[in-house]
Amino acid sequence: ISTLWEGWELNSATYGGGTYNHGWTGGPATLLSQYVAGISPLANGFKTYKIQPQIGLLTSIKAQVPCPAGLIKVNIQNTPQQFTLSAEVPIGMQGVISVPILADIYSEITCNGTVIFANDKYINALPWLDLVPGNEHYLNFEVKNGGKIVFVGKNRK
């Protein structure tokens, strides 16, 4: 859905509205992109961003959010074999991407094809990426520049 109608029964005798798009019906789209896909600003005007998806039992999530620098796009695939979070962020933007810790299942995590986490330890292999403090639910990575960023968590089993 690219446009959310103010009412679904437009032009019916029982509906008194008259526009095809209204701000308050955009709430679900905002909630899905901000909380399920996890795309949110860390600073005013989206100067920095955070991507922290809340996957639950979903097997895929795809979202994009406009910001002053351009579009932030997220595509997530979650299978029993691996977890993939692909993000496209405008060049020059800094932010944090959080990889969910789905139990204790990752044998390794790669970023853009380079191993960055193995044997339960972070490997500082990319100059534009750092592990930053998180919690028991996420591994948080500070990304120092935009572009295409792909995290792949390969499952132990």
Where are these regions (language model features)?
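Non-catalytic C-terminal accessory modules of carbohydrate-active enzymes
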Residues: I1-K157
